[in-house]
From Swiss-Prot:
Cellular component, GO annotation: host cell cytoplasm; host cell nucleus
The protein's name in its UniProt record: Protein E6
Function, as annotated: Plays a major role in the induction and maintenance of cellular transformation. E6 associates with host UBE3A/E6-AP ubiquitin-protein ligase and modulates its activity. Sequesters tumor suppressor TP53 in the host cytoplasm and modulates its activity by interacting with host EP300 that results in the reduction of TP53 acetylation and activation. In turn, apoptosis induced by DNA damage is inhibited. E6 also protects host keratinocytes from apoptosis by mediating the degradation of host BAK1. May also inhibit host immune response.
Gene: E6
SUPFAM superfamilies: E6 C-terminal domain-like
Subunit annotation: Forms homodimers. Interacts with ubiquitin-protein ligase UBE3A/E6-AP; this interaction stimulates UBE3A ubiquitin activity. Interacts with host TP53 and EP300; this interaction inhibits TP53 activity.
Keywords: Activator, DNA-binding, Early protein, Host cytoplasm, Host nucleus, Host-virus interaction, Inhibition of host innate immune response by virus, Metal-binding, Modulation of host cell apoptosis by virus, Transcription, Transcription regulation, Viral immunoevasion, Zinc, Zinc-finger
Length: 150
């Protein structure tokens, strides 16, 4: 993998597979934090979440599900700035919500329009973390509710 220059290194798992003649199914990639190989499901989830490949010493890394959520929580604790309703997010950015890529604060999946609409309809605030507006996807929002149930 050392044959690629920094400017031409693949940024997505799809590009990485294409460049090296692999498929997502047979891609073996390590977690940037724990160094374990991602499972097939984690590779597909990473691709689905449209996350970028991290390069260290000309070697590609991704993030396993546990480390991604764990580090997202740490990032939120360290870098949380404020929460705001949708109209404040639109006013501050100058863009409509549907024009913005807002990720889930836990799993980093880009929120769908229906997930953004849920924030609007329920009056749920978005969080400004590390200079990015974040929210909660349907899956992670469900996990929070499950923890509160008896």
């Amino acid at each position: 993998m050392s044959g690629t220059s920094a400017s031409s290194q693949p940024r997505t798992l799809y590009q990485l597979c294409k460049e090296f003649g692999l498929t997502l199914r047979n891609l073996q990639i390590s977690c940037i934090w724990c160094k374990k190989h991602l499972t097939g499901a984690e590779v597909l989830a990473y691709h689905f979440k449209d996350l970028v490949v991290v390069w260290r010493k000309d070697f590609p890394y991704a993030a396993c599900a546990f480390c991604l959520e764990f580090n997202s929580k740490i990032c939120a604790l360290r870098h949380y700035e404020r929460s705001a309703f949708w109209y404040t997010v639109e006013k501050e950015t100058g863009l409509l919500l549907e024009e913005q890529q807002i990720r889930c604060a836990l799993c980093q999946k880009p929120l769908s329009q229906s997930e953004k609409n849920h924030h609007i309809d329920t009056g749920t605030r978005f969080q400004f973390i590390l200079c990015q507006w974040t929210g909660r996807c349907t899956h992670c929002r469900g996990q929070c509710v499950e923890r509160r149930l008896p």
